[in-house]
Curated annotation (Swiss-Prot):
Binding site for hydrogencarbonate 1: 136, 140, 142-143
GO terms of biological process kind: antibacterial humoral response; iron ion transport
Region (Connecting region): 338-348
Residues annotated as domain Transferrin-like: 26-338, 352-684
Chain sites annotated for binding Fe(3+) 2: 402, 441, 537, 605
Organism: Xenopus laevis (African clawed frog)
Complex and partners: Monomer.
Full protein name: Serotransferrin-B
UniProt xrefs under CDD domains: PBP2_transferrin_C (cd13617), PBP2_transferrin_N (cd13618)
Disulfide bonding pattern of the chain: 29-64, 39-55, 134-217, 179-192, 245-259, 355-387, 365-378, 412-696, 430-657, 464-543, 488-685, 498-512, 509-526, 583-597
Length: 701
């Protein structure tokens, strides 16, 4: 064979190799020989035509997290404490699937942390000091975070914080002797049963590790109490053991719902946040749980997955460790790391960190900061939902939201503080800090005069929306259309649209234009922010003027952008008389007839915050309004309800004042049952449910 032929043959083989699809592989990290044996069994029994499983053994969870972060492994299933740790630097991992402890039809992604004792003992919860204790592992949810947090909260355990001593040292003084796999304090490893280097290791190489191990520690009389989950004690042993309740009573094992330390999030599968293997891991596990024994093993209990799991459920793509665990549990873990000094009085908060959603909002907020004397500080976010997350994580304190986003905020745990009020013909409510009067506005459908579009013939029409999830621009019109058509696929009903927040490749983004002038640092077509020129009320109206056939906005939108009110090039020559409203009965009406021709009367925008910050935020905002509101003493210096360089910045420009919402008002009460129910129904259409809402409502621990 001559050289040329051999070269040609080699090149052909190389091309063939390159053309062949690369084999997909999921590398599972295991922490002991027993887990490795189970993993190898799964390799042999879980056959997937496209994805193969392999096993990577590491001595403990921390090294598994490192291996995944460094791309030497892909996944591991861990408890909430390790979900928290894995979500932090340097790991930056995220949960992608959760264990389900319910059934295939009635899912349950939570479990109960409990304290188990022998019936023959007599001590109460408040008498735990100087008892011998058995724990699942250091930093684990049921076995450490929950019980230690509760002991600190009840002031049974004294700890001056990490500046004085480690939490482990304080706990080692509290209990007489313990087995806490993974601990460094000798007294916390004294009762462990591992041999040589495996003694007290945070893996199944330590016999007393995890739930079954902690219970065995109690069974072997190495401890007086075991901190585990509700399903740890086999039914055959229920007659010999009972639960220790925080109220100093005892109850049978079966009464765990009435006697527990906390209800906590399920174990979850972690992988890298950059999503390079997420789809493969989910696809493999979804098929494997049908064909293989993922949740049991001949080699021991709770190996790789908990035996009590019945399935694995994919998490919403926007889920992260904080959202999965919830603010209360995440903050509780943080408190265990930072400590709370006895008799310490928290420093008084003196400033509200306001979340801004665009460069124009940030500019206005910066001006506000300058003249507020330090009462206002500004944070930056890309969208309303990002602001909600900032507040949940403690990175911001407040933001003003539309009713649709308020619904999401409420489902995520935020509360309404101050509501916008718009009626300039009746300013009586503005004379009081709080009023029984609630601000409202009207959701309307706007069309150009002379066109043939009506509410009755919207099929195939080009539509313009403020953003997905917003009240007037999405929830009301799409909810009404969905109810009328009995079809969740709104995109298939109308023609092309601009609905910021939709998939940029979908019909719902076809009319969007991003930022045509490229004035902003980041121009993202169809982004639910000022990065998209057709975002918001004025943006949806501009979309109608330039591309669409109907715009869904509020009743004042036409007036705010016509007859010389908006100097922007696209709006400066528009006349309000050139537009009409589409009425639900199929007729049309002048834009001035919004009270009789509208899609719905809807709740005002409002300022939201965390429940524990409600009073503080209200005090600051009320004070700022007295200075810079429409009747403020220093309104000539700064106006809270006017915008330069944009529309409706921080607050709607039509706001006359902010009214304090009565304390303990829930988000549902503020929004009203009718609107709340409408949004709840709309969100049953998976195509319309936001990623953040899906994350916040995934489980109820």
């Amino acid at each position: 064979m001559d050289l040329a032929l051999r070269v040609a043959l080699c090149l052909s083989m190389l091309a063939l190799c390159l053309a062949m699809p690369k084999e997909k592989q999921v590398r599972w990290c295991v922490k002991s020989k027993s887990e490795l044996n189970k993993c190898r069994d799964l390799v042999n029994t879980c056959k997937n035509k496209e994805i193969t499983l392999s096993c990577v053994e590491k001595p403990n969870t921390d090294e598994c997290l490192t291996a995944i972060q460094e791309d030497r492994a892909d996944a591991i299933c861990v408890d909430g404490g390790d979900v928290y740790k894995g979500s932090l630097q340097p790991y930056n991992l995220k949960p992608i699937m959760a264990e389900n402890y319910g059934s295939q039809t009635e899912t349950d992604t939570c479990y109960y942390a409990v304290a188990v004792v022998k019936k023959s003992s007599t001590f109460t919860f408040d008498e735990l000091k100087d008892k011998r204790s058995c724990h699942t592992g250091i930093g684990k949810t049921a076995g450490w975070n929950i019980i230690i947090g509760l002991l600190l909260e009840k002031k049974l355990l004294s700890w001056g914080g990490p500046d004085t001593e480690s939490l482990e040292k304080a706990v080692s003084r509290f209990f007489k002797a313990s087995c806490v796999p993974g601990a460094k304090e000798p007294n916390l490893c004294q009762q462990c049963a591992g041999k040589k280097e495996h003694k007290c290791s945070r893996s199944n190489n330590e016999p007393y590790y995890n739930y079954a191990g902690a219970f065995k520690c109690l069974q072997d009389d190495k401890g007086d109490v075991a901190f585990v989950k509700q399903s740890t004690v086999p039914e055959a042993f229920h007659k010999d053991y009972e639960l220790l309740c925080p109220d100093n009573t005892r109850k049978p094992i079966k009464d765990y719902k009435k006697c527990n330390l906390a209800k906590v999030p399920a174990h979850a599968v972690l992988t890298r946040s950059r999503d390079d293997k997420t789809k493969d891991i989910i696809a493999f596990l979804q098929e494997a749980q049908k064909e293989c024994k993922l949740f049991s093993s001949q080699y021991g209990k709770d190996l790789i997955f908990k035996n009590s799991a019945v399935s694995l459920i994919p998490l919403p793509p926007s889920m992260d460790g904080f959202l999965f665990l919830g603010a209360d549990y995440s903050n509780a873990i943080q408190a265990l790391k930072e400590g709370v000094k006895e008799d310490e009085v928290p420093a008084a908060e003196t400033k509200v960190r306001w979340c801004t959603q665009s460069k124009a909002e940030k500019n206005k907020c910066d001006d506000w900061t300058t003249i507020s004397g330090g009462a206002i500080e500004c944070t930056e976010a890309a969208s309303a939902e990002d602001c909600i997350v900032q507040i949940l994580k403690g990175d911001a304190d407040a933001v003003t939201l539309d009713g649709g986003y308020m619904y999401t905020a409420g489902q995520c745990g935020l509360v309404p503080v101050m509501g916008e009020y718009y009626d300039q013909d009746d300013l009586t409510p503005c004379q009081r800090r709080s009023s029984g009067t609630k601000g409202v506005y009207y959701a309307v459908a706007i069309a150009k005069k002379g066109t043939k579009v009506s509410w009755s013939n919207l099929r195939g029409v080009k539509t313009c929306h403020t953003a997905v999830g917003r009240t007037a621009g999405w929830n009301i019109p799409v909810g009404l259309i969905t109810n009328e058509t009995k079809n969740c696929d709104f995109a298939s009903y109308v023609g092309q649209s601009c609905a910021p927040g939709s998939d940029v490749k979908s019909k719902l983004c076809a009319l969007c234009i991003g930022d045509p002038e490229k004035r902003l640092e980041s121009s993202k077509k169809c982004s639910p922010s000022a990065s998209e020129a057709y975002y918001g009320y004025s943006g949806a109206f501009r979309c109608l003027v330039e591309k669409g056939q109907v715009a869904f906005a509020k009743h004042t939108t036409v007036f705010e952008n016509t007859d010389g009110k908006n100097p922007a090039g696209w709006a400066k020559d528009l006349k309000s008389g050139d537009f009409e409203l589409l009425c639900p009965d199929g007729s049309r009406a002048p834009v001035t007839d919004y009270k009789s021709c509208n899609l719905a009367e809807v709740p005002a925008h409002a300022v939201v915050t965390l429940p524990e910050k409600r009073t503080f935020v209200a005090e600051i905002v009320v004070n700022q309004q007295s200075l810079y509101g429409r009747k403020g003493f220093q309104k000539d210096i700064f106006q809270m309800f006017e915008s330069t360089g944009g529309k409706d910045l921080l607050f709607k420009d039509s706001t006359q004042c902010l009214l304090e919402i009565p304390k303990k008002t829930t988000m549902q009460e503020f929004l009203g049952d009718k609107y709340h129910t409408a949004v709840t129904s709309l969100n049953k259409c998976s195509t319309t449910k936001s990623g953040l809402l899906a994350s916040c409502t995934f489980h109820s621990c």
